[in-house]
Amino acid sequence: MAHKKAGGSSRNGRDSHSKRLGVKKFGGEAVIPGNIIIRQRGTTWHPGVNVGMGTDHTLFALESGAVTFNKKANGRTYVSVNPITKAAE
């Protein structure tokens, strides 16, 4: 007897949800402690001054201030937060 698979949908048509990675706060933007600066896979950007790194390599602010990106001689890009100093009253 001749057999044929039942006509079904194609085997394609699946995809994963986007992970919304990337820079969330750009250079010069103000941040407060806990603000996420960058979501990444691996260490494309490295934490600098006043920046912490989570277990999933997310970079976040430890102090209030402005975000800066610095490229060092070793080829790595470091993300730092420069604190905003208030004038003495």
Curated annotation (Swiss-Prot):
- Show the segment(s) annotated as Disordered: 1-23
Q: Name one GO biological process term.
A: translation
Which InterPro entries is this protein grouped with?
Answer: Ribosomal_bL27 (IPR001684), Ribosomal_bL27_CS (IPR018261)
- Annotated keywords: Ribonucleoprotein, Ribosomal protein
Query: What GO MF terms are annotated?
Result: structural constituent of ribosome
Identify one Pfam family in the record. Ribosomal_L27
Q: Which GO terms describe its cellular component?
A: cytosolic large ribosomal subunit
Q: Which family does it belong to?
A: Belongs to the bacterial ribosomal protein bL27 family.
State the name under which the record lists this protein. Answer: Large ribosomal subunit protein bL27
